[in-house]
Amino acid sequence: MRVLTTVLCSALLALPAAAWAQAAAATPAPPTEAAPPTNGGVDVGAQFTSVDGDEARYQRYRDLRNGVLVDGFHITHRKDAWTFNATATHVGYRDQKYTGEITKAGKLTVRFSWDQIPLFYSAADSDQFGLLSATPYTVESPGVSRLPDSLQSAVQATPSLLNSAISSAAQGVEIRQLRKTADFAVVYHATTSTDLLFHLVNTMKSGEQPWAATFGFSNAIELPGPLDHRTTDITGQVQWSNERGTIRAGYDGSFFSNNVPTLVWDNPLRVQDGATGVGPSQGRMPLSPDNSTNGVSATTAWKLGKQTRVFGNLSFSKWSQDSALVPYTINTLLPVFPLERQTADVSADVTGVYAGLNSRPNDRSWLTVRYKLYDYDNKTPEFPVTDFVNYDTSVAAFAHGGTDALSYKRQYFDADYSYNIAPFTALKAGYGVESDKRTFRQFESTKDQTFRMSLDTTGATWLMLRAQYNYSKRTGNGLDEEVFDAEDEGSALPRQFDIADRNRNRVAIIATVNPREQFSMNFSGGYVKDEYVNSAFGLQNQDGRFFSVGADYSPQAHVDVFADYGYEKYGTLQKSRQANPGTQEFDTTRDWTTDGSDHAHTFTAGVSLKRLKEKVDADWMLEYSNAADSYTYGLAPNQTIYVPPAALKQLPGFSQDRTTSSLNVMYYISRRVGLGAGWLYETFNSDDWAWTQETLNALSLPISGSHQIVLTRYAYRPYTGNTGFLKVRYLF
């Protein structure tokens, strides 16, 4: 009320002066103050973090360590036609980012950025469960992980000692990786109609990640797997354009190199290689190989008259990989089989086509037609295999006789016609068909046809609405019965859900209501149902439903309040048959099902104050999510799988929730200086039936008896984290 009174009094006092000014001769307005050639700002302060529980999961993709904070730096400098911009965030931390741009108006733009994204898997710090992450392995050299020989000798002699031996040898280990991306781009306007473009992206990954290194199902190993690789992407293009359209052509290359091509790790159960059926003293596996892609492409968009525009893209690329192949086994006591060739000799030709047309036949209708082609033609020669070594333990015959080169061709045609049935209201009908051809799959080809209808309106000033219904039907052709064995599989019917026959119904609605200028509401909802009509086993059906509702209120120009709630629920039904070869394969009383159900609630609310009374910026946001799932097993009414007293045991449900709250306040004590503070709170909890003190804390499972699973203790553990920020902002 006091502010309103002051404004009214000021307006009344100004009236006589305003009247005099109207009567007097107009005087020229004073010149406006020119923008300074250099301006910017920076935040300097500190951040403080406290975590109870899993520190790694709290930090995850960010770095919230205690320390000095230099954040939000930005600077702009202008001179004549040149402009320079630069930014820096979270300087010196693992998630730091820097950007820079130099522009000469109408002639040149040069951009550069350096972006780091950490991924923190698990920490070695102690919590209420003990060490969060530990391993008995030590890194001898990149890609080589070793156990103490004494541990292997003791366990080989007495396998029941594995748990105690692993626990005594284990040391805490941090498992984390860091992705660093350098991005450089240049746009040079050579002439009024011709541009030259260059783009270089260099992405490096280093560190570790949880890695499964197994000797088979009975001897599974988890250890920190090495990461040290680089991807370089290069693009060079020339673009010509005029008032009717544009044409662009260029080269694209992508090159991947891995500094750790193989992983070798010790077997905790043996210190010496064993003959057939005994097992090796170590294992070896190839990691991601060096590879490259080289391609050319052309893109165009062109006007045909006043009402029609055509556009398209054509690309050809060559994928290749020729790294050295790993021998069949590292076990020195097993036979050595010569490789058909010493390098991979892998290559593929990839063709991409995208073409379309937008047209407006009259003022009330629109027509859009699109076509896409993706052709992956695998040129890799066959690799004959007669015998191979199974898990470095024994020699086995390879019945298939060699490798199969996977190829596929995907074509997509789509057309939409829209008609304005009323002012600012359109009814749209569309049809799309996707045709896929694949090699060495249960179906040689599939066709997925989609029919859709939608209604869009902005006819009322207070309402925006879209409602859409889709029906799609996928069918397979050319069933390859050679991939089935009737005696072993029971029936030659497809059960791979990505190619099996499927009918889908989907409806969705999105609406925004603005009853007042300061207040708006939004709503979205939908339902989808998939039915796999010819799948005797595997996925039978799945459905999903979702809706969200939200509101935004701005009582004043500097104040905004919002809240949103969302709900999602998904279900699946899968079917199988527990059967041994023989008559059981056709016994329907041995059928069983898994009914899966997942649902999630999310709630978000916040308040934003911008330059309230020219002094205060403040933002507060709360996010809460809760998710739960369950799996219910079902049997046939006359089931014969369980013979009393044996009975089916259901799994308990699983749930988890996360709450995040953030508050940031900045108070400006002058036009250039502000004092700020912030607080981040996050908590995560989980109720998982697979979690017990044994599974959470053990480095090998089970704790008693013969142990053949070695872990790093990487798991989804609960945590509560708090981070505070103090900073001084200086603007210049």
Language-model region placement:
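Gram-negative bacterial Sec-dependent N-terminal signal peptides
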Residues: 1-21
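Gram-negative and organellar
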Residues: 23-34, 48-102, 106-732
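Mature N-terminal segment immediately following signal peptide/propeptide cleavage
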Residues: 37-47
